[in-house]
Every structure is written in structure tokens, then in C-alpha cells.
Amino acid sequence: MPNNGYLDKSVHWKVRAGQISFAEPTHGEIADAIRECGLATEVGQRLGSGKEADVYLCRSDGALRVVKVYRQYRTSHRADRGSIKLESMGQRALRELDLLTYAWQGGARVPEPGRRVENMFSMQYLGTPQEIAPMLQHAELARPAEFLALTIAGIEGLAEAGVVHSDLSPFNILVHRGEPWFIDLAEGVRVDRLGYPPWIRLQEAIHSVERGARALGRYFRRYDLEVDAPDLLRRVRAKIDLFRVG
């Protein structure tokens, strides 16, 4: 199915015919859907659960992959609870995959994107065959100062690729082969194109970097390290203020 923002028409026919239940699907039903649409040949355990989506460990012809599935009805957003979101969850999966693709093509350290089907998409697995790469929040760093420098460089790398992570925190950075890898770009900001007025897009991106710097600062203080937020903002702004409006 092409990566456009619309669900397959058969989904709507099934809704109208009463063939689709509006209860959140079980793990078995999700696994069946992942296999049937060709995103993986084997579906294992759920690796994690976020505000709107769940992540599953899968295999595709033996190779480890990850599949992210946006929940259709159950989210942590109060306004969304109980609503029917077949269209919007497909749109959100599309948006995140697009941001991941732009970042990856721009050389940022993010999982290699796969493909999307409706509210699900696949991407690169990070870790060993025995264990997934840990979140920074749960990792013990042997060289924290070096890792902090790599993280700052990674944030700049995302900006150079035209993407700013708007939910940057130790929970959205994985430690893989001693380096930071950025995940969960669902609410990221594109800064390499027109659309919104440039000043509005710039301010949104800068506020995102400020929040991320505070979150990372709280984490690295456990190692008696400080995140130089003003310097990070200055360097990121220089990369994303394409129209010199800031």
C-alpha cells in the first residue's frame, strides 16, 4: 500500500458493515495484522508502550525488526479517549515515518525506516540478538562526558537533517554500541521547508530544544555534568534559521 495519508477503502467498508470492532485489538490480533500486511513474518513481545503507540519486536525473514503500532482508540490524551481514530492514527504513523525518513536520509543517528501500512510502520532494530538497546534513562554510562558530547552532536545532526525532536528526553534516546540513537519522532518539527511562516516554525523548534536541554540536564547531573543549554540553542539556531528570521 502506498504511504499516503488515507486508509484502504476496505477498512471503511468493514466499519460500515459492522465487521470491525471498536475495542482495542489483542496482542494476537495485532500480530496477525502485522504479518498479514507484510511488515514482519514473526511477531514477538511488546517492547514498550507510549502515549499513543506500542512497539513490538518482530522478525522479517529471520532479521530482527521493530514495528510501531499506533493505537486506534486508547491513548493517554483525555480528549481522544473513546474516539474513533482510524484516519488520524494512519496520519500520525505516516507523519512519524516521514520525519524518521528525512532524519535518516540526512545522516542523523536514527533507526533506518521501513514502510508503513495504515497505522503501523517498521524500522531498524537496535541492540543485540539477546537484548534491545537500553534507553539512556536506564543505562549506566562508562564515559558520560563523551556520551554527552555525542548527544549534543546528535541533536545538531538532526537539525542539519531538517528535523528537531520535540520530545527529547533520556527516554527517547537509546544507547547502542556506545552511541546515542534518537527515537520517537512523532511530534518532531520539520525545519527544512516552507509551510508555516518561518518565524513560527523557528520558535516552535527552539522551544523544543529548550525543553530537551532541560530534560537532558536533569539526567546528566547524576554524573556531575551540565548541559550548556545556551550554547546548544545557539548552535541549533544557526543550523535551522534558514531565513534569518530569529
Regions inferred by a protein language model and the residue ranges of each:
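Ferredoxin-like alpha/beta domains used as RNA- or RNAP-binding modules
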Residues: M1-A40, A139
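C-terminal/domain-terminus segments
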Residues: P2-V15, L136, L233-G246
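Surface-exposed, interaction-prone regions with an acidic/low-complexity signature
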Residues: W13-S21, P25-T26, Y70-Y73, A139-R143, ...
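Conserved ATP-binding subdomain of kinase catalytic cores across diverse folds
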Residues: F22-I132, E156, E160
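Short, glycine/acidic-enriched loop or turn micro-motifs at the edges of active sites
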Residues: R71, G127, P170, V175, ...
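Short glycine/proline- and charge-enriched loop/turn segments
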Residues: D80-K85, Q130-E140, V189-I200
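Conserved kinase catalytic-core helix
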Residues: E87-V110, A133-F171, H176, P180, ...
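C-lobe/activation-segment region of protein kinase-like
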Residues: F147, A159-H165, H176-G246
